[in-house]
């Protein structure tokens, strides 16, 4: 449901009402656009997974608990079977990007392993805005599925020894549970040792 943004003004009642209605319409349109975008990216993720012909489980969640630690605590999943997809960017122009998948219990080694894999002098996590522009996904929902085909994907080898892994589903409202073996079937994917520390 849309909520009007009420702004205190010194106008008469009519002016205030008109201002509130306009704000409400803008808010409704923004929310509609956000829902449409979320549904489109979720559909793309499902199409990729279905195209791989592999079994997977979709976990619908409250978007407020999309961040991995909050998700695990809220829904009772183990943190050591959860992974985060993080977009990394070079700091210098022209910008280069890659996607890294690491366990939630570890930390990406951006300054050494990832930087060397990218062949750049300095690298850092991409901003939320750059991540959205590149992938169409919000932080907390980013997944290795449905990424641009030319984007390098680096997966921590520790993930491959798990019986299952849970990762983002494309939006903050979904998680995907599947066998790590599936990850090797994605294009432009490399399994990397010491990706995380």
Name each model-derived stretch:
Residues 12-13:
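Short, strongly patterned local motifs
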């Amino acid at each position: 449901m849309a909520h009007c943004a009420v702004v205190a003004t010194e106008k008469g009642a009519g002016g205030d009402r008109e201002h509130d209605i306009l704000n409400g319409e803008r808010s409704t349109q923004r929310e509609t656009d956000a829902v449409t975008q979320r549904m489109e990216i979720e559909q793309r993720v499902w199409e990729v997974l279905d195209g791989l012909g592999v079994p997977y489980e979709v976990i619908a969640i409250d978007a407020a608990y999309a961040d991995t630690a909050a998700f695990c605590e809220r829904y009772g999943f183990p943190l050591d079977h959860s992974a985060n997809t993080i977009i990394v960017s070079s700091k210098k122009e022209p910008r280069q990007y890659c996607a890294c998948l690491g366990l939630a219990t570890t930390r990406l080694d951006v300054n050494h392993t990832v930087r060397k894999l990218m062949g750049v002098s300095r690298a850092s996590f991409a901003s939320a805005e750059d991540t959205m522009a590149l992938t169409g996904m919000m932080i907390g929902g980013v997944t290795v599925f449905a990424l641009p085909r030319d984007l390098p994907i680096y997966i921590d080898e520790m993930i491959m020894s798990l019986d299952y892994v849970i990762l983002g589903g494309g939006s903050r409202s979904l998680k995907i549970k599947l066998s790590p073996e599936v990850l090797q079937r994605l294009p432009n994917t490399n399994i990397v040792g010491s990706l995380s520390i």
